[in-house]
């Protein structure tokens, strides 16, 4: 049974299938009766909750407050910002009626044709329109600014090709929407929140990211600038892991949100929006996990330490229980989440396989000999290394080990990412290297036409125009690898999810 539990497709054989197997077998999520909508199972949701809690703290530390806005948006609202509606029109789910009735033939329920809405409602694909319609009532003077609101919600965008966590029709996310008196303040906010996302990804998820600005072609619909964090998965593909948008005055003008400034003149408000979603779960899984299952960073693991007893009889189990009780209390006192699994309905081998599959960072085992010697076997999930350690001060040992694991999996991901960054000067070399995966730094002439040609030829897109330190040496001007026209700096290309 333990072997069946971990019978995952190997990454080297089929990376995509390995990912799908892992999400299901590790009890993170599964498909639902509704196409494109997933069920996030308790263990998967526990990881998301830890992400949510940490991000929420970081938002509040930067002065943001939470609010909630309606799920349904009048269709006319989406017509007010032309670029915005064009960007989302094909993905919108539309509510046309407000009532069902029993079918006359008794076959069930049907839509009541008499209950047609005067104006159709859109299930939110994102909330800029409904929020800016609301902000109009909240803002009259510069004294009402800034507004720094965040919303935790679900959104819906019809997706035809779905993958659990990475691309689903309904997904959970947070969306921040801020209003400012000046352009400078709004631009600073957009960058500040990108940096919050970058810190969260690297410090808590242990996922190294490249920060930069999107090309005009990849920009959020209705934004003047879109900033992004891009992560690299183990197959060399990029995953956009968070975006922050400088919206200028587009939405303020669309919804006529003006304020009296300090000079007593009417002016349109400046705006940002920013968001991350359950897609981060996909990034977490694909960055660290291996052929044995999940590898979770301790900072986000629902269970950081699991303790499993191995015993010959009930009397020995009682003695182990008594010993472990004190160890559990000491670990909890240090803020470590610990589970003692002394259930007798599964064998130790099954438990080992299950917790390995679920990525629990540290496993402690106590058997009869350990009881006599005042020791425990410690296994770390990231390297699968085992060590026998004295029970005296084991809580401090484990605390340090968790920090070491967090640092190690970040370093491993960073080393891999850096080993897969290539600089090229010619299009022929680009086409060759893109087949190997990874990030490619190359010159581009800044035109949408060249960007589209590269995408059509190679399936690679511009992930961002980077402002990260590791590409500082590539900030020099050059010539576009495709057209030979002038290029201000190298940009990051990759195939992506």
From Swiss-Prot:
One of its GO terms (molecular function) is proline-tRNA ligase activity. It is found in: Cytoplasm. The keyword Aminoacyl-tRNA synthetase applies. Its EC number is 6.1.1.15. GO terms for cellular component: aminoacyl-tRNA synthetase multienzyme complex; cytoplasm. It comes from the Bacteria. GO terms for biological process: prolyl-tRNA aminoacylation. Keywords: Aminoacyl-tRNA synthetase, ATP-binding, Cytoplasm, Ligase, Nucleotide-binding, Protein biosynthesis. It holds the Pfam family ProRS-C_1. The keyword Aminoacyl-tRNA synthetase applies. Disulfide bonds: none annotated. It catalyses: tRNA(Pro) + L-proline + ATP = L-prolyl-tRNA(Pro) + AMP + diphosphate. InterPro entries: aa-tRNA-synt_IIb, aa-tRNA-synth_II, aa-tRNA-synth_II/BPL/LPL, Anticodon-bd, Anticodon-bd_dom_sf, Pro-tRNA-ligase_IIa_arc-type, Pro-tRNA_ligase_II_C, Pro-tRNA_synth_II. SUPFAM superfamilies: C-terminal domain of ProRS, Class II aaRS ABD-related, Class II aaRS and biotin synthetases. Consists of three domains: the N-terminal catalytic domain, the anticodon-binding domain and the C-terminal extension. Belongs to the class-II aminoacyl-tRNA synthetase family. ProS type 3 subfamily. NCBIfam families: proS_fam_I. Catalyzes the attachment of proline to tRNA(Pro) in a two-step reaction: proline is first activated by ATP to form Pro-AMP and then transferred to the acceptor end of tRNA(Pro). Homodimer. This is Proline--tRNA ligase. It comes from Bacteroides thetaiotaomicron (strain ATCC 29148 / DSM 2079 / JCM 5827 / CCUG 10774 / NCTC 10582 / VPI-5482 / E50). The lineage of its organism: Bacteria, Pseudomonadati, Bacteroidota, Bacteroidia, Bacteroidales.
């Amino acid at each position: 049974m333990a072997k069946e539990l971990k019978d995952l497709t190997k990454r080297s054989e089929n990376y995509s299938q390995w990912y799908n197997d892992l999400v299901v077998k590790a009890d993170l999520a599964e498909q639902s009766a509704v196409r494109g909508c997933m069920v996030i199972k308790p263990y998967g949701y526990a990881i998301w909750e830890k992400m949510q809690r940490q991000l929420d703290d970081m938002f509040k530390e930067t002065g943001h407050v939470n609010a909630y806005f309606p799920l349904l948006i009048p269709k006319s609202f989406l017509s007010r910002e032309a670029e915005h509606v064009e960007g989302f029109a094909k993905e919108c789910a539309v509510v046309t009626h407000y009532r069902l009735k029993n079918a006359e033939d008794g076959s069930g329920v049907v839509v009541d044709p008499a209950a047609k809405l005067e104006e159709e409602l859109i299930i939110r694909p994102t909330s800029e329109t409904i929020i800016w319609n609301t902000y109009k009532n909240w803002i009259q003077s510069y004294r009402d600014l800034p507004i720094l609101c965040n919303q935790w919600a679900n959104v819906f965008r019809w997706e035809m090709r779905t993958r659990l966590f990475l691309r689903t029709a309904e997904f959970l996310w947070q969306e921040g929407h801020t209003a400012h008196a000046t352009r400078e303040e709004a631009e600073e906010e957009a960058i500040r929140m990108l940096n919050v996302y970058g810190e969260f990804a690297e410090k808590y998820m242990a996922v190294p990211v490249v920060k930069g600005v999107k090309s005009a072609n990849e920009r959020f619909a209705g934004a003047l600038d879109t900033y992004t964090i891009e992560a690299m998965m183990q197959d060399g593909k990029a995953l956009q892991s968070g975006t922050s948008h400088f919206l200028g005055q587009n939405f303020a003008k669309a919804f006529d949100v003006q304020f009296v400034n300090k000079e007593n003149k009417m002016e349109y408000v400046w705006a940002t929006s920013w968001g991350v979603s359950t897609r981060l779960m996909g990034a977490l899984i694909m960055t660290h996990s291996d052929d044995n299952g999940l590898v979770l960073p301790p900072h986000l693991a629902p269970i950081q330490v699991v303790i499993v007893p191995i015993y010959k009889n009930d009397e020995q189990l009682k003695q182990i229980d008594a010993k472990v009780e004190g160890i559990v209390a000491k670990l909890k006192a240090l803020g470590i989440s610990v589970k003692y699994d002394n259930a007798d309905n599964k064998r130790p081998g099954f438990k080992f396989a299950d917790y390995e599959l679920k990525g629990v960072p540290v496993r402690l085992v106590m058997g009869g000999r350990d009881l006599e010697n005042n020791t425990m076997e410690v296994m770390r999930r990231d390297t699968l290394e085992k060590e026998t350690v004295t029970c005296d001060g084991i809580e401090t040992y484990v605390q340090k080990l968790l920090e070491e694991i967090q640092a190690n999996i970040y370093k491993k991901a960073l080393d891999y990412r850096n080993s897969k960054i290539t600089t090229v000067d010619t299009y022929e070399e680009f086409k060759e290297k893109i087949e190997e995966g990874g990030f490619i730094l190359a010159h581009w002439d800044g035109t949408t036409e060249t960007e589209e040609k590269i995408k059509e030829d190679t399936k690679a897109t511009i992930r961002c125009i980077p402002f990260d330190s590791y590409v500082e040496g590539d900030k020099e001007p050059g010539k576009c690898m495709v057209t030979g026209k002038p290029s201000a700096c190298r940009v990051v290309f990759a195939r992506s999810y």
